[in-house]
């Protein structure tokens, strides 16, 4: 990669990071001017890299999904299928409860913007399919390694876990202590089920 391309990638990354912070603070109505000022670039640089505000919003959503997936996959990398599935639940719950700017933006884009913006809806559907498939595969892996009962319908369990995690994502308005109680109850139920 050339020095110029590397600099462009770095600028693009800095813009996305600044947009995440700005959208978390001001909502999706945050101005291009404010984001450009946060990064120390011109508004024209934002248009150069993303084409439009909608293009920047799409890239922020994709980056939020990449970060979430990376953290959850890393947390659930080792162990039996059962251990990995439970680690995925724990990691997701911790990340959702963190209320970091990144997760506030992920929630906002996932729950509202994706329903209003067709390009974001396509990204959301792809992410949901990938997430569901990953959870179903963890259940099947657990069935193969003997850590999850083979009598269980792997698809039903994976879909249930996915639905619960989606539910936890939407509970951001609840106090953190309440969120932790709900996650603990779900995790206990899941342990008993598996």
Where do the model's predicted regions map?
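Short, intrinsically disordered or compositionally biased N-terminal tails of bacterial proteins
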Residues: 1-3
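Helix-turn-helix
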Residues: 10, 14, 18, 22-55, ...
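Alpha-helical elements of Rossmann-like donor-binding domains used by nucleotide-donor carbohydrate transfer enzymes
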Residues: 14, 18, 34, 55, ...
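Hydrophobic alpha-helical connector segments
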Residues: 59, 73-104, 154-161, 183
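Helix-loop "lid/cap" segments that line or gate small-molecule binding pockets
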Residues: 74-75, 90-97, 106-115, 188-194
């Amino acid at each position: 990669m050339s020095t110029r391309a590397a600099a462009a990638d770095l600028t693009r990354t800095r813009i996305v990071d600044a947009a995440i912070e700005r959208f978390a603070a001001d909502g999706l109505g945050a101005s291009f001017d404010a984001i450009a000022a946060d990064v120390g670039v011109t508004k024209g640089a934002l248009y150069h890299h993303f084409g439009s505000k909608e293009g920047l919003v799409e890239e922020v959503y994709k980056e939020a999904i990449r970060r979430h997936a990376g953290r959850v996959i890393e947390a659930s990398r080792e162990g039996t299928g059962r251990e990995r599935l439970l680690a995925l639940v724990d990691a997701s719950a911790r990340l959702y409860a963190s209320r970091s700017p990144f997760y506030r933006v992920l929630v906002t884009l996932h729950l509202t913007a994706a329903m209003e913006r067709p390009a974001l809806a396509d990204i959301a559907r792809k992410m949901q399919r990938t997430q569901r498939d990953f959870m179903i595969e963890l259940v099947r892996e657990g069935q193969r390694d003997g850590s999850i009962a083979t009598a269980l319908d792997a698809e039903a369990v994976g879909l249930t876990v996915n639905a619960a995690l989606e539910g936890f994502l939407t509970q951001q308005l609840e106090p953190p202590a309440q969120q932790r109680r709900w996650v603990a109850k779900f995790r206990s139920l899941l342990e008993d089920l598996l």
